[in-house]
Structure formats: C-alpha cells, structure tokens
Amino acid sequence: MLPASLQRKAAAVGGRGPTNQSRVAVRVSAQPKEAPPASTPIVEDPESKFRRYGKHFGGIHKLSMDWLDSVPRVRVRTKDSRQLDDMLELAVLNERLAGRLEPWQARQKLEYLRKRRKNWERIFEYVTRQDAAATLAMIEEANRKVEESLSEEAREKTAVGDLRDQLESLRAQVAQAQERLAMTQSRVEQNLQRVNELKAEATTLERMRKASDLDIKERERIAISTVAAKGPASSSSSAAAVSAPATSATLTVERPAATTVTQEVPSTSYGTPVDRAPRRSKAAIRRSRGLESSMEIEEGLRNFWYPAEFSARLPKDTLVPFELFGEPWVMFRDEKGQPSCIRDECAHRGCPLSLGKVVEGQVMCPYHGWEFNGDGACTKMPSTPFCRNVGVAALPCAEKDGFIWVWPGDGLPAETLPDFAQPPEGFLIHAEIMVDVPVEHGLLIENLLDLAHAPFTHTSTFARGWPVPDFVKFHANKALSGFWDPYPIDMAFQPPCMTLSTIGLAQPGKIMRGVTASQCKNHLHQLHVCMPSKKGHTRLLYRMSLDFLPWMRHVPFIDRIWKQVAAQVLGEDLVLVLGQQDRMLRGGSNWSNPAPYDKLAVRYRRWRNGVNAEVARVRAGEPPSNPVAMSAGEMFSVDEDDMDN
C-alpha cells in the first residue's frame, strides 16, 4: 500500500499523461489515516543544550544594580574640597600663632561655619578674592557678608503676602521703640532736673562753708586781739594759739583729698597745740606688711625648679607644648629617653616646633624640616647648605618623682631637685590631671591655702553637708606645715608654687571634725602645682593619692570620673577667683581686712612679695633681714598677732 502522498502524485501523473488512454480504476480499501512523520533537522542547533535550562539561559545576561543601594558611599575628596579644608586648618594655625584663641576654640567656631557648605564655599571665594590672611576674624566677616547676600536673595523670592506681614511686624516694633524712646526721654528729663537740684544744693552748701570759714577767722581775730589786749604776760600763750591753727591748716593741705568735705574745728585751748599727724592709708599699711597683690610675675620666681609635666604624659615621640613666664616651650624625649625642653619657636621662620614631630629623638619643624636636639642646636637643614651655630634656647630639664622638672632661672640650676613631690609612704597615686586655669597663679595658690571658704563655696561637692563652725583656725609651725582646726587637714606650701594637703577621712567621701589627720584611719593626699604660665594664666598640675582602696585604680574609666570631680570643684572656686582678679584689674585689693584664718595665705603673699629682695640678698651673700624677705623655711615662725588690723 502506497503512502497517501505517493497516491496523490500517481493520480496526478495518470490524469495528465497522454499515453494512458484508458482509465485504470483502483479500488482502495478504507485504512486508518497515519500521522505524518516529524521532520528531521539537517543541522543540529548549537544552543539547544542550553535551552533546556530555561528560555533565557545562555542569552544576554543583565546584572541587577539594586545591590549598589546597600553599598556604603565613599566620599571622594576633590581638589576644591581639599582647598576648603585647607582654609580651615590654616585659620586654626593662624589663630594659634597669634595667641588670640586656643586651637580647639577656633576649630569649634570654624567647624560650625563649615556645616553650611554653600556658605563655606562662598566664604572661600571671598577670602581668595580678597587675597587676605585666613583668620577667624576674616572668615567671620566673610560669613556675615554671605549671610547678608543670601538673605537678600531670599528676600527677593519672598511673596507679597509675606512682605506685607514683615512690614506690619516692623511697624509694631517701631511703635514699641517710639514708646520706649518717649519713656527714656522723660527719665532723662527727670534726671536732669534732679541734677540741677543737686547742683543748687551743692552751691548752697559751698556758700555755707565759706560763711562758716569767715566766721571762724573772725572769731580767731577777736580772740587774738583780746589776748593781746591783756598785756605781754600772755604773749607766749597767744603765740601758741596762733601756731596751733596754722599747723592744723598746713597738715590739712598736705593730707590727700577725701570724697567728703570735712571741717577742721580749732581747739578752744589756745595754749595746747593739737597733734594732727596724718594717718597712713590702708594701702600703705598693706605694702608695709607685704600684702600688696599684683598681676605681675616677679623675676625672682624664675630661680626655682618647676614641675612642668607628669612623666606619664610624656611618652616617646611626643611633643608637649607649654608656657612658663609668658614664654613658649616644648618638651620631648631624646634618643636615650631623657626629657628635654627647648623653646617652641623655630630658629628659621619662627614656626612653633610643637606642630612638628619627633624624629630619632630630635624635633623636626613642620615648615621646612629643620631638626633640633635636646640642647636646642640645629642638626639638620634640608634643601640648603648647613649653617653652624644655629639653634634655639633650651632649659635645664630633669625627671624625678613622676614629674618633668625645668629650671627657667639665670645661671646654673640648683644641684638637687626638691624631694617633696613623692606621695607619702603607703599612698598610691590614683589621678594625675593637668588644667589650664585663666587665673593669676598667686590668687589660685591663696585659694588653695584657704579652707575656711569650703562650707560656703563647695556646697555641691566635697563640702556638702558641712556645718559652719564657730571658728576656723590654722596652727602653723616652722616645718613648712600646719593643720586646720576643726578640720582634720594638714596643709603646707612649698616654694615656689606647690601646695600639699593630707585630709583625714572617717569613710570614703566623709570628713571628721574635732580630730587631727593623724588620728583618722583613711587619708587623701593632694599635690597642687600652680605654675605661672603667662600673665593671668596658670598651668595647674593636680595629683591625688590614697592610702586605702587600692583596687580602685583598676576600675575602668575611673580617670574620667576623677577628672569630672576635679573640674566640678575647680569650677566652684574659679567663679570666685575670677571675680577677685577682675576687681584687682580695676584697682581693688583682696587684702583689705585679713582675718586670723588667712594666716597661711598671708604668709605666702609676704614671701611672694619679698622674693625679689630675697634673691638679691642671697646673691650678695647676706641673710634675710625681715619677715617680708624671709626664706621659705622661716615664714611660719611669725607670731599670732601679725593678723591684727
């Protein structure tokens, strides 16, 4: 049986062929229809093996970029952004070199201005266009102008309704200002009227005074004429009577003018002259007693060893800048680990060396790379021929009892270092804190030597709950020490600027009364170093030691707690001492009326005021001749009556 396709072909051929004259009938039985066979591809598809994994497998792959949204963005610093940051750093450096602000204060203000990036870019354009030095004042001026320009732009964009509201607000403010101006004018008129009344009263009083003077002179003339009329027997008494008013008048003229007008009344006894010697002023009395305070730093204070820094705060390859007697210095350790101190000013262009770094025990200047050793000599000058005998000043430096000591005086320093800085036996150091205090160091020392103020000043810190005693007294002795009554506190002053105190504690945080420090079980030892940094500033080094609770040194972050407590106590004192300093600058005195419990501070002030004379006498080989110029070891031997006013 032929396939259906062949049957159709055969039928077509048979019907068209001319040779077939007769039609052949073929009878085909009914058969089931078969499905046509599948076509077999001639060439195999090379991608067919991939299509079995999916219709898109093996095609063009598109990577989804959604994962980039979760990737942290990395900020790329461009040249413009670096220039903006460089302007901030340059302004901080200029403020530090000028000494107008501390670097952290300038940086804080500049960082605040940089938060508004659009303003900061315009500030940079303004400073660059002006070709001015990048200082804080210049940047603040540029910021003000930028704010004005931006506000003008904002004003231009303001709607008419908003402008109308602003105009109404300004009108209300003008009306209020006019009312205040009218009130001020009325008060001024009242004050002028009162001034005129006072002038009239003063004129009346002046007339009365002149009239009384004429009356007194008339009475004197009458008395003299009466005595002269009695005869020569009373001539001597009349002469005495004449001399008495004359003497009084002469002394009255020489006496300094007072704020109130006083009237001299002549004695009725013309035979006895009146002693009218002028009394000394309180300022003269204070000067004679050595109690004259001043903001100036005596030159005689230079000839002492000063603990300038804690040893633990001066590791290797570290620069510690500080000021002493108004001069900049920087400390570091040399290649042997020994402390050194040189002037913080490069010998080349005056750049602060403390901005540089320590390279193999020598300080490298950050400006041109000059290097200086511990003696101040320049040892390296890159990019230029080396010049000898170039260097900076250096201070004698030593290390003892956990302190770095420097000698700022003239000539050779003392051979031995002080030995009182070490804590007493049985005590362990718990805290070492350095603070720059904006107070003259003498005022701060006097505050530390005064304990009578504690119940009134430190009511929120260590003296909380202390009752006010009936009396407070300091008992001094000749060993540069003494103790307070009724508090269990031993206190001492060590020249030139150190105070030591040992406090007896009943239990941690509480103090006992009516006993001495030696009678207490637990003790707290304090050392305050008040180094004269510059005029009106003190570099304060504070060390605290305890003879109990040794495990407390290992408590995490305990140093932060001690710093916070010390800052709180110092803040309570600082408000008062700054007020004293302000009154001193205005001509006032903090030694008008000393009290008995001021004994220790009084003797410090006497020693301080006589230190120049003391140094001069010691250089001349003479011993001290009076308590004002007495040495440190003798200043506690003055009697109790030196506190009398």
UniProtKB/Swiss-Prot annotation:
Residues covered by region (Disordered): 1-46, 258-287
Binding site for [2Fe-2S] cluster: 346, 348, 365, 368
Topology relative to the membrane: Peripheral membrane protein
Entries under InterPro entries matching the protein: Cholesterol_7-desaturase, PaO, Rieske_2Fe-2S, Rieske_2Fe-2S_sf, Ring-hydroxy_dOase_2Fe2S_BS
EC number(s) recorded for this UniProt protein: 1.14.13.122
One Gene Ontology term of the molecular function aspect: iron ion binding
SUPFAM superfamilies found in the cross-reference section: Bet v1-like, ISP domain
CDD domains for the chain: Rieske_RO_Alpha_Cao (cd04337)
GO cellular component: chloroplast inner membrane; chloroplast thylakoid membrane
BP GO terms, sorted: chlorophyll biosynthetic process
Name used for this protein in its record: Chlorophyllide a oxygenase, chloroplastic
Main location group: plastid
Enzyme class: oxidoreductase
Lineage, top ranks: Eukaryota, Viridiplantae, Chlorophyta, core chlorophytes, Chlorophyceae
Gene3D superfamilies assigned to the protein according to its UniProt record, in alphabetical order: Naphthalene 1,2-dioxygenase Alpha Subunit, Chain A, domain 1, Rieske [2Fe-2S] iron-sulphur domain
Binding-site positions, Fe cation: 446, 450, 453, 458
Stretches of the chain forming a coiled coil according to its record: 105-218
Role according to the record: Catalyzes a two-step oxygenase reaction involved in the synthesis of chlorophyll b. Acts specifically on the non-esterified chlorophyllide a and not on chlorophyll a.
Annotated compartments: Plastid, Chloroplast inner membrane; Plastid, Chloroplast thylakoid membrane
UniProt organism field: Chlamydomonas reinhardtii (Chlamydomonas smithii)
Reaction equation(s) it catalyzes: chlorophyllide a + 2 NADPH + 2 O2 + 2 H(+) = chlorophyllide b + 2 NADP(+) + 3 H2O
UniProt keyword terms in alphabetical order: 2Fe-2S, Chlorophyll biosynthesis, Chloroplast, Coiled coil, Iron, Iron-sulfur, Membrane, Metal-binding, NADP, Oxidoreductase, Plastid, Plastid inner membrane, Thylakoid, Transit peptide
Record domain Rieske: where: 305-406
UniProt keyword annotation of Calcium present: no
Biased composition, class Polar residues, residue ranges: 259-271
